[in-house]
């Protein structure tokens, strides 16, 4: 018999690490699927009367599906809608505009941190314990960008300090990098797409990512690293404006551009350390990706 509780837990874990594609046991004949058409009004039969309509959603459950999470927000227009999200005094359009203005006004990391602390356009701030800004050496040549704080990060106010962070530190040490190193060539600087923990460690919604996106974009511009590393699917897909899952993006080099940068930055996508904790068999390919990062770093010209 199927262990339902285990199946649900496994599915929740897959969603948490960014899995976004389902593969069937048998190949799908898309030519047959495409040939199917929706029934016409005549074929579908008469419209339902109110008495035969589906029952309303039970109390405490939404009658509409949850907001779909999609990538490619880096180039998406501002989200519309004047209604404010729960816990936010701003509507989506106003929140995005407010974030963009506050982020662009910052010229130093300290300014950006203060602007983030003063920003109230994302409802996640209302439920989080801490604003998780960054950790490591801001002068490092390598900047790592994760997805969102977890429980330990929310408590301590720093990114990657839980079990996944411990593994990340070991991964970095294996190629001679350390978040606490003073020498920029041996240090890393770490931040996240979102500075606030989503309740229950759920994936952030499109609107939550969009509200915070201008801050991480400006963060990259001010820190001005030589290499970017995206940890996990949400980070990679959002900042690279890609639709592929992380298993297809990992190990590949991309050019990351932004108006505030003087040149495109080489960017590498890696599997999230949380994924590696649950799927140790993927460490082999991640090791190859880390070696690629080391070679790219060694090939950089000296900083002036």
Name what the model sees in each region:
Residues 20-21, 25, 29-30, 37-304:
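A polyanion-binding, active-site-adjacent surface
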Residues 1-24:
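Non-catalytic accessory regions outside enzyme or core folds
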């Amino acid at each position: 018999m199927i262990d339902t509780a285990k199946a649900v837990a496994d599915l929740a874990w897959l969603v948490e690490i960014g899995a976004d594609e389902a593969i069937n046991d048998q190949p799908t004949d898309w030519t047959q699927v495409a040939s199917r058409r929706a029934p016409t009004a005549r074929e579908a039969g008469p419209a339902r009367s109110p008495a035969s309509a589906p029952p309303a959603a039970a109390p405490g459950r939404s009658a509409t599906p949850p907001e779909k999470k999609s990538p490619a927000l880096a180039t998406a227009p501002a989200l519309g809608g004047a209604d404010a999200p729960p816990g936010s005094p701003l509507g989506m359009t106003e929140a995005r505009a407010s974030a963009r203005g506050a982020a662009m006004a910052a010229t130093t990391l300290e300014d950006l941190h203060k602007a983030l602390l003063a920003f109230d356009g994302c409802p996640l701030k209302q439920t989080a314990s801490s604003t998780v800004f960054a950790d490591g050496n801001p002068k490092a040549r390598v900047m790592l960008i994760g997805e969102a704080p977890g429980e330990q990060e929310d408590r301590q106010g720093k990114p990657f300090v839980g079990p996944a962070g411990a593994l990340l530190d070991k991964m970095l040490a294996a190629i001679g990098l350390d978040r606490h190193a003073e020498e920029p060539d041996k240090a890393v600087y770490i931040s996240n797409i979102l500075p606030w923990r989503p309740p229950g460690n759920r994936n952030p919604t499109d609107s939550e990512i969009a509200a915070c996106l201008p801050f991480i974009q400006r963060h990259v511009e001010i820190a001005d690293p030589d290499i970017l590393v995206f940890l996990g699917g949400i980070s990679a897909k959002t900042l690279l404006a890609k639709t592929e899952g992380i298993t297809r993006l990992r190990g590949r080099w991309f050019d990351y551009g932004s108006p505030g940068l003087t040149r495109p930055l080489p960017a590498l996508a890696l599997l999230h350390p949380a994924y590696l904790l649950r799927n140790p068999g993927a460490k082999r390919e991640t090791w190859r990706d880390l070696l690629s990062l080391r070679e790219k770093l060694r090939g950089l010209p000296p900083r002036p």
